[in-house]
Amino acid sequence: MAGTSAPGSKRRSEPPAPRPGPPPGTGHPPSKRARGFSAAAAPDPDDPFGAHGDFTADDLEELDTLASQALSQCPAAARDVSSDHKVHRLLDGMSKNPSGKNRETVPIKDNFELEVLQAQYKELKEKMKVMEEEVLIKNGEIKILRDSLHQTESVLEEQRRSHFLLEQEKTQALSDKEKEFSKKLQSLQSELQFKDAEMNELRTKLQTSERANKLAAPSVSHVSPRKNPSVVIKPEACSPQFGKTSFPTKESFSANMSLPHPCQTESGYKPLVGREDSKPHSLRGDSIKQEEAQKSFVDSWRQRSNTQGSILINLLLKQPLIPGSSLSLCHLLSSSSESPAGTPLQPPGFGSTLAGMSGLRTTGSYDGSFSLSALREAQNLAFTGLNLVARNECSRDGDPAEGGRRAFPLCQLPGAVHFLPLVQFFIGLHCQALQDLAAAKRSGAPGDSPTHSSCVSSGVETNPEDSVCILEGFSVTALSILQHLVCHSGAVVSLLLSGVGADSAAGEGNRSLVHRLSDGDMTSALRGVADDQGQHPLLKMLLHLLAFSSAATGHLQASVLTQCLKVLVKLAENTSCDFLPRFQCVFQVLPKCLSPETPLPSVLLAVELLSLLADHDQLAPQLCSHSEGCLLLLLYMYITSRPDRVALETQWLQLEQEVVWLLAKLGVQSPLPPVTGSNCQCNVEVVRALTVMLHRQWLTVRRAGGPPRTDQQRRTVRCLRDTVLLLHGLSQKDKLFMMHCVEVLHQFDQVMPGVSMLIRGLPDVTDCEEAALDDLCAAETDVEDPEVECG
């Protein structure tokens, strides 16, 4: 339509021109504005309006009226029809002029455009309805998802709230239990402090009354209760019962003092400076004082017998740990050097041992290795170990004794490792005190020693001997604890032989102690031990203590030596053969343990340790060092001389039997040295020692009379048979066997006929034994013939 209307519009824009036609009086309305045409222009047949194409004002007003009525009264379709009708009427009226026919085509085109627009409108309206429906669907889905999300969030929030409440309840319950246990512990501590204060008050009254008695009756000689054997200890004062207060009376307290103090069993130890004979400072008195107070602590642990570590717990909490000693694990856990002597704050069971524990302040001044904080840390670890062992399951994975020599597998019990820092602390403290004592003896001025100066500064006058004497009790207790740990915990055995420290702080401190000990004036054995950097610090200290105790004398020193050897024996017994080379450093210390001054029980333990170490092919040849310190030579000399006059005959027989079986094991495993070494004096002494042992064993069987009936008699007969086989083996391998028998020829002549008759009369005698008897009897005749010719 735009192309159609363009010419018309172009013509309308031209200037008007006169138009030919009929005059105005012909009936057509005159044009409102005259239009003129150019002379060259011709009428356009396509123009529907012609020269009179413009609407009049009435026409425009009528169109506006129709449009407004159509918009306000009729719907879209009716509005279109009405407007079309009005337009037709208008156009019919206008068709009376000459150009009316051309104008009739305009409404048709407009109607077509209107229909197209209406179709587009309907299509867009349908699309809009579809979009609205999709929007409604999406809104519904969004609402559903939002509701589901809210519901899930509410569920999660409820679960989170319930979990938080549950955790809060658990925390509150644990806090309540902790407060309850703390109150109980404070109550027990207060009770112990109260009892301790009462004991101190009773001591003061007792001393006052004794001084008054001395002043009132100076002519009466005072007999110390400690030296009076006629005093009888009342059992009700020494053995408290559960639920009964065991507070000692004056008589029972004096009777308890008749027990000898460990420091005064040997003349080489001096009493504490300013201490009276009647002063109740013995360890036995302290144990009687605490036994009732610590019973509840012990019973609470022993009730947990349903766990795998109950056996170890019961052994550790036994009071006392060692017969003849008054100390236990409770003393090590409650020991401290903070409180001065005689105050209510003094820890339970400390009593007279405060002077010895003053070494804490002494050695702690060096590098903090034995400070009070280190002791508290070790005690806290030990308490943790008690809890872990009490509730730990017995695991046998990775057992160092697995596939080894134990009949039953060893439990791991890794919680037992937490006891090692406490044991290491007291053993290291004892080693430090021994070093101070040695330095004081070398300098000749014991008053200048660090231990002595610290004790004087702390208000307790004592000397290094007293400190060492008191610390020996704690060291023996720590060694006993270590023995139980090694016997029942595979984790402890693995840790001690692995070279890794149990506690970093304690390990570093004790490692510095080992270096101080090795840098001083020590023996070559101690220097050899300190040079091995792959050892566990506690194992190093154990070897140092073994060397110290084997060189000293005294009852407690013998106990320390025995406990050290027991720990080493159990450690070697519970480990596998692969770990036995770790014991190579023990050969440097064992010669001191076989000296004539060593008690027989310690020598017996040393032989048992050697028998265990001989199972390894690398360690067996080291029993003979081809020098004066040869272990076999020292052992032969100890057996033949029998220096321990206190030991029983049965103990000597047991030692001889263990030595015979050790030599039999060495002879089977290595037919060459050490049993028949040609360059060592032990090659000469072995014939003499075996002959002496054969004679003694034979006399024992002869005194018993008849066939063997008891286990001990059967062991003796077994030892006789093994000794005969050993002597026969030596006679076959040693060319100088005849010369070596000359010194014990009378014993050899006396014992061989009886031994031959005894062994041949046994029902299970073997051909080897009969052949050995024949050869030895023939050798006896060969030895006698030269003497007859000389005669």
Curated annotation (Swiss-Prot):
GO terms for molecular function: K63-linked polyubiquitin modification-dependent protein binding. Residues 15-27 have a biased composition (Pro residues). Residues 118-156 are annotated as: Interaction with CINP. Phosphorylated by ATR. The keyword Nucleus applies. Residues 108-217 form a coiled coil. Residues 36-54 have a biased composition (Low complexity). One of its GO terms (biological process) is DNA damage checkpoint signaling. It is found in: Nucleus. One of its GO terms (cellular component) is ATR-ATRIP complex. The keyword Nucleus applies. A motif (EEXXXDL motif) lies at residues 769-776. InterPro entries: ATRIP (IPR033349). Residues 1-57 are annotated as: Disordered. Ubiquitous. Interacts with ATR. Heterodimer with ATR. The heterodimer binds the RPA complex and is then recruited to single-stranded DNA. Interacts with CEP164 (via N-terminus). Interacts with CINP. Required for checkpoint signaling after DNA damage. Required for ATR expression, possibly by stabilizing the protein. Belongs to the ATRIP family. The EEXXXDDL motif is required for the interaction with catalytic subunit PRKDC and its recruitment to sites of DNA damage. This is ATR-interacting protein. It comes from Homo sapiens (Human).
